[in-house]
Amino acid sequence: MSRIFARTIGLIVVALIIGEGVLRGIGIPHTLDSGWKWENSPGRKSSKYNDLTTNQLGYRGQRIHYDTDDYVVVLVGDSGLEAFAGPPEHMPEQFLLKSLSSRFTKPVKVFSLAASGWGQDQQLLAVQEYFKTYRADLVLLWPTLGNDYWENAFPDRSPTPEAGHLKPTFRLIDQELHGPYFRSGSYWHGSAVLQLAESAIAKISKETLEQRILRNWIKAMPAPHESEKQAHEGLCEGLTVIDQREFYRDIFELDPNIGYTLKSGDDFLNSRGFFSPYMSDSSERDRYLIRITQMLLKRIKEEVERHQAKFLVFHAPREEFDRRGARMVKCVSDSQGSIFRVSFDYEGLLKNIISSDDLVIIDLPWGEGNKHVVSPEDRHLNDIGNEQVMERLAVSLMERSLFDR
């Protein structure tokens, strides 16, 4: 009986190996479509400047070319650096190049590694990709502090319960980063056979493969919130209720002396949203977002320094987000009707996860109004805003004596 069992197991293993080879050979199922650069960027889809103007690595921006004596600066980020609302010649890399070149006699080159919707997980992979071929003297990372934390924790890009586009990401286990998982061109579970089986189950369940991947991923994450509707409903009573998009669109027309509850479509119960790192009563999963972001930034810094370059993170506090919005928003409600108290301090949290030696805070007198943003509905910085940030960043770098004049 034992010989028959062993022979049966052996035949199954051989069949699986043969099946794996056959499936890979005929391309069924397709490998994972994971991550994105400029060609498939969410920003490009909504931009009127959507030509495939990219560097050699596929990111929006000028071609990567430098001479031996050039001081090479690499900007790393997301939609802020991709600047999809404007032409390529008005990207932050161009403004920073102009500002640095006017201050230093040594030739300077500036290049971008950025795409809309990126967190530090895809940024880390981009930095690793860059250093396989190119060098840098300085790497500057521009975080988006309302999005990066939750983006870093999940294998998809969506703040709702519905799974978004798949992306490569990492998992934090016992304070160690593991991954990346779900790299483009790979198979889920590392197997075409297993991915085909998962796809069949997903089809029977009338869901996407991405939704199945997300559900599987979430099971291994720290504990989420229980429903906070009853716990916080009384604390948020009497606040002015307003849609989140409407709030930020009209923020300079609203009364800054009263508190607001923002209605959001985000999935705060599962820590998938703009305010998740800033919950007054945070869940284990909320705190996990912060820890994994800290570890990803640490890994990026290590990668940069391993290639003999300097690493800095810079943040330009915004009037509508860091100051006015932080004072006015007291509560948020999510897509499932749960209500949460929030208290957010972008700069304060950033200072908790980044050493002051590696952080540049760019204070600008933004004032009230929308002259520095694309539009009231789209609060990405426009050419005016980006030029001001890059000008002040250049001054800050000069003050740190990072360049020879």
Task: Go through the PLM ranges and name each one.
Residues 1-72, 87, 133-137, 149-153, ...:
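N-terminal secretory targeting modules
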Residues 146-351, 367-372:
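Serine-dependent acyl-ester chemistry module
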Residues 112-114, 315-317, 363-365:
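Residue-level recognition of beta-strand->loop/alpha-helix junctions
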Residues 72-74, 80-166, 240-261:
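Conserved SGNH/GDSL esterase-like catalytic core that processes O-acyl groups on lipids
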Residues 5-7, 377-405:
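Histidine-centered active-site loop/cap adjacent to the catalytic His
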Residues 120, 124, 290, 294, ...:
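Short, amphipathic alpha-helical "lid/cap" segments that border enzyme active or binding sites
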Residues 24-104, 127, 236, 246, ...:
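Membrane/wall-proximal cationic-aromatic binding patches
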Residues 80-86, 112-116, 286-290, 339, ...:
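Second-shell loop/turn segments in exported
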